[in-house]
């Protein structure tokens, strides 16, 4: 492992991302694929870049990311959380502005479980009066 490498773990919904950042030219590799190849949606790419753009670190780090579980949006959120934690490990003074933007807090919202007697978590079967 490189001596000047910083690490952050990010989680969102059922996704978990491991993020390694080291000084470089702004290369982002996710599961051995480029950011553009991995995320087809522009919104997901934007979410991943948010902490870097906020802290003006876009071309300063190479990112190596492995992410598992969940869907596109959950994985993008997990990566964002991981990048945020890695940046804070690199420079603790960034914590304030990252916290203000809401990137430091782990989004605790999970899928609500399906209940017995209901069709989904809250959707009830149709009610017939007579």
Curated annotation (Swiss-Prot):
Domain of life from the UniProt record: Bacteria
UniProt entry tagged with the keyword Transmembrane helix: no
GO CC annotations on file: cytosolic small ribosomal subunit
One GO-annotated biological process of the protein: translation
Keyword annotations of the record: Ribonucleoprotein, Ribosomal protein
GO molecular function, one term: structural constituent of ribosome
Keyword Ribonucleoprotein found: yes
Family label: Belongs to the universal ribosomal protein uS9 family.
Name under which the protein is recorded: Small ribosomal subunit protein uS9
Biological source species: Serratia proteamaculans (strain 568)
């Amino acid at each position: 492992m490189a001596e000047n490498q910083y690490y952050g773990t990010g989680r969102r919904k059922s996704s978990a991302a491991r993020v390694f950042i080291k000084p470089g030219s702004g290369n982002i590799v996710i599961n051995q694929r480029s950011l553009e190849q991995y995320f087809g949606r522009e919104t997901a790419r934007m979410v991943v870049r948010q902490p870097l753009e906020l802290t003006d670190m876009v071309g300063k780090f190479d990112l190596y990311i492995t992410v598992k579980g969940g869907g596109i949006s959950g994985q993008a959120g997990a990566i964002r959380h991981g990048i945020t934690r890695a940046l804070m490990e690199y420079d603790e003074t960034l914590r304030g502005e990252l916290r203000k933007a809401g990137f430091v807090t782990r989004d605790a919202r999970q899928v609500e479980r399906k209940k017995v007697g209901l069709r989904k978590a809250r959707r009830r079967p149709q009610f017939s009066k007579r």
